[in-house]
Amino acid sequence: GEETELNGQGPKITDEAIRELYAKLDEIQDGDTLVLAGSIPSSLPADIYERILERLSGKKIRAVVDATKDLLLNVLKYRPFLIKPNNFELGEIFGVEMKSTEDIVKYAGKLKEMGAQNVLVSMAGDGAVLLDENGKTHVCGVCRGKVKNSVGAGDSMVAGFVAGCEKGDYEYALKLGTASGGATAFSEGLAEKDRIYELLGQLG
């Protein structure tokens, strides 16, 4: 089938709202996880992600960044815990076409060299690849099901991966992330727990 996505204009973010955001961020404690995802509204500084990570650089947090091109590249110096480009975004960053899993592993490795601790690359119908902080490469296939709505699937994958990391097992985290993304893609809305664990069973 065909999917049509309509993206409206985001709100104008005021200086007061930015100050409120910083105040909330200052409450983050060591061991917490912060997810920065998506594009930057035009009313915010283009380097807002960098400013946030610089502000929190003295804390031992797990920063997750799901963004594209310069927005992603410019935060690598802060050694984010996880970044999640898809295969097309990875190709855009380096100006090359990703033709194989080997290509993805090669260029994801370059992002690790630039500072990322873990690099998770989603490949739509071809599964996902994870290069973890311990130097291991993990490959995961896709779940079986009918795609109803792909919006939010990438965000669900990040959420599932982060939740899976609580076990300290990157192989499991990758599978839980994949199942979470699939559960959203196969639903009219967002993933639900029962569906996630049903799909997790497909991944072994």
What are these regions (language model features)?
Residues 50-136:
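Conserved phosphate/ATP/ADP-binding segment of small-molecule kinases
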Residues 3, 89-91, 145-146, 164:
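A short, flexible beta-alpha/helix-coil linker loop
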Residues 43-51:
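Active-site core of PLP-dependent enzymes with the aminotransferase class I/II
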Residues 11-14, 40-44, 71-73, 92, ...:
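Short, small-residue-enriched loops and turns at beta-alpha junctions
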